[in-house]
């Protein structure tokens, strides 16, 4: 007996009822992004492995432990399923010279892959909305991206999402802070866990992001990066805060917010909630002014953020925001050979007029078909038998208005009657 094949652990099917919800969510996202002038870009889900090692950093959890990497058996090329979208987007911007003559505002929606332990809100295949800008160096674009998040939460009817901010300064400022951190943690080496000891001389900033309760007090007393920032970095950070205060967007400065990728500088931010358990970050990003040059392009200021689709959808549901399932306008019932041929012509004619039609297939009695019509959620049933087919007519029955009369109409008059009743129904609501 053959083994039943199942989806890979941590990689989930999105079934029709759920996928319809996702489509509604993605439509909202695209409309929101276009309202800020962002344009779509689509990149491959497979990229050269060196891209992520150079962009994300060799000494990061993603590169060390979480990437799905393999060697192409045909040509020996090292490839990786993308664990995040920014590196691939920057690669595309450089390869196609997109930022040479003008600023760019880009977005993408798609799958990412990380070999993590699957749990609520964390999957091995997950979906992200990524938003990236190129060519804008001031704090205004940082602030705009944060304000975009605030508007989206309002549009989605979400509350309880809090904004945390920090500044990572410039590389030379981080170098001074790094030296101070190493000295501090070496002086308290007996309090470090094994992960912190491993990171101490490679990426000590990441120690501050530890989830180990036993190290929280130690990290809270560690040297703070903001004390090492120069005048320009401080002015940039204050510029972001000023816009947020003017817009009435509350925030908390979190000196331990460092992000898990090496390419960030200056502003970093996260939107977090306590409604999703341990996986509380729903949106995160910041500036990465050195990444384009680091990957072979010309020096280009850049800023971006990403949102987890699964987490946002879970948050919408947690907040009681389940949308109504979409339903067809018409369920087309037919019986008889002539009626079946007429049904195809009628269905296509109604679709030509923008009416959504679910046409019955598979035969069955009028009674069984009408039962399916009622269960479909359709507003109307259009009924065609051989008698109606012979005279070019059809029966129109409302499935939602109790006591309404069943009308016999010429096929050519169906669309006008349906559209008129749909408009009347919308006005009553």
Curated annotation (Swiss-Prot):
Listed EC numbers: 6.1.1.21
Gene Ontology molecular-function annotations: ATP binding; histidine-tRNA ligase activity
Gene Ontology annotations for the cellular component aspect, listed alphabetically: cytoplasm
Gene Ontology process terms (BP): histidyl-tRNA aminoacylation
Xref: InterPro entries: aa-tRNA-synth_II (IPR006195), aa-tRNA-synth_II/BPL/LPL (IPR045864), Anticodon-bd (IPR004154), Anticodon-bd_dom_sf (IPR036621), His-tRNA-ligase (IPR015807), HisRS-like_core (IPR041715), HisRS/HisZ (IPR004516), HisRS_anticodon (IPR033656)
Catalytic activity: tRNA(His) + L-histidine + ATP = L-histidyl-tRNA(His) + AMP + diphosphate + H(+)
Keyword terms: Aminoacyl-tRNA synthetase, ATP-binding, Cytoplasm, Ligase, Nucleotide-binding, Protein biosynthesis
Record's subcellular location: Cytoplasm
Protein biosynthesis listed as a keyword: yes
HAMAP family for the chain: His_tRNA_synth (MF_00127)
Subunit architecture: Homodimer.
Similarity comment: Belongs to the class-II aminoacyl-tRNA synthetase family.
Protein name: Histidine--tRNA ligase
Originating species: Dechloromonas aromatica (strain RCB)
Gene name of the record: hisS
